[in-house]
């Protein structure tokens, strides 16, 4: 399967290492880089994580914007300028940079949330609050989903 699914909570050690769930690593197994690319979410108080293929898609989307627009500059700065490549160690762990941990309020635990083509890393209590909000939105907007044939 080539999508990130499910939710996992893993501990973060004193060296800021956290284990990426095995099934997430399996999705990334086809990537050229043995690790992930992480950047601060521009939507939520979390870290967005993906492989190189998704970063390429983001690059192509951003390149459609006027090269001198504020929007393009902001997206390039927040996504590419703040992105870091995080290699897996022998145990499937990554080291979370302090800047990303601060952005997401992560300390001792990290909540991994599958979002299809990306996954997010949250502070667990913050994710639970967001989950309630997301459930309400999904319930209200459920009829907007369409079948794709």
From Swiss-Prot:
GO terms for biological process: negative regulation of DNA-templated transcription initiation. The keyword Cell membrane does not apply. It is found in: Cytoplasm, Nucleoid. InterPro entries: MraZ, MraZ_C, MraZ_dom, MraZ_N, MraZ_sf, SpoVT-AbrB_dom, SpoVT-AbrB_sf. Forms oligomers. Belongs to the MraZ family. PANTHER family: TRANSCRIPTIONAL REGULATOR MRAZ. This is Transcriptional regulator MraZ.
């Amino acid at each position: 399967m080539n999508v990130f699914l499910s939710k996992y909570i893993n501990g973060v050690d004193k060296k800021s290492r956290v284990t990426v769930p095995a099934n997430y690593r399996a999705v990334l197994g086809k990537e050229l880089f043995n690790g992930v690319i992480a950047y601060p979410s521009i939507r939520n108080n979390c870290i967005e994580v993906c492989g190189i293929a998704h970063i390429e898609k983001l690059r192509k989307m951003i390149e459609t914007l006027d090269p001198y627009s504020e929007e393009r500059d902001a997206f390039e700065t927040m996504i590419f300028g703040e992105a870091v490549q995080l290699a897996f160690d022998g145990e499937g762990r990554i080291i979370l940079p302090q800047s990303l941990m601060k952005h997401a309020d992560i300390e001792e635990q990290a909540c991994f949330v599958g979002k299809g083509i990306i996954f997010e890393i949250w502070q667990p209590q913050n994710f639970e609050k967001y989950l309630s909000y997301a459930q309400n939105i999904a319930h209200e907007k459920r009829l907007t989903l369409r079948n794709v044939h």
